[in-house]
């Protein structure tokens, strides 16, 4: 399993976007990452200027969003949807997407994934697919 460090994950996003903007060939995962960065112009300055942002710690104080974490969760959700893991995720996403735009539906998945990961960390367990899917059902 690929388990990058914080810096490796951040550098991956920066490099994928840089290659995309330069018109260089991208791996399938880099293509997904670049497309997700493209959906978030509010993060372009962060991604395009790693010398200013790569080492920065983002805290929840003041409602600050960690753009690297947000994009990494987007990427995780995209991978989950590709393989319908956990089973039923794609169907839940389609229900959500039927009631809002696709990007908003993706954000609902990200929020539920974040809640599921937070709960697993708090309890000292692995992520619970039932908790994840139940969260999505409540949002549909």
Placement of each model-derived feature along the sequence:
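Well-ordered alpha/beta subsegment
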Residues: 107-111
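Residues lining hydrophobic/aromatic ligand-binding pockets adjacent to catalytic sites
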Residues: 114
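Aromatic-anchored, charged helix-turn/loop surface patch used as a conserved interaction hotspot
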Residues: 29-96
């Amino acid at each position: 399993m690929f388990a990058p460090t914080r810096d490796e994950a951040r550098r991956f996003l920066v490099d994928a976007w840089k290659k995309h903007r330069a018109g260089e060939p991208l791996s399938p995962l880099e293509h997904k990452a670049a497309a997700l960065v493209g959906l978030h112009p509010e993060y372009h300055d962060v991604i395009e200027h790693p010398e200013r942002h790569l080492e920065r710690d983002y805290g929840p104080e003041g409602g600050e969003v960690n753009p690297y974490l947000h994009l990494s969760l987007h990427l995780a959700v995209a991978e989950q949807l590709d393989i319908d893991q956990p089973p039923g995720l794609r169907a839940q996403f389609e229900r959500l997407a039927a009631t809002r735009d696709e990007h908003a539906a993706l954000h609902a998945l990200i929020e539920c994934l974040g809640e599921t990961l937070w709960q697993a960390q708090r309890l000292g367990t692995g992520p619970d697919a039932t908790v994840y899917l139940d969260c999505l059902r409540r949002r549909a």
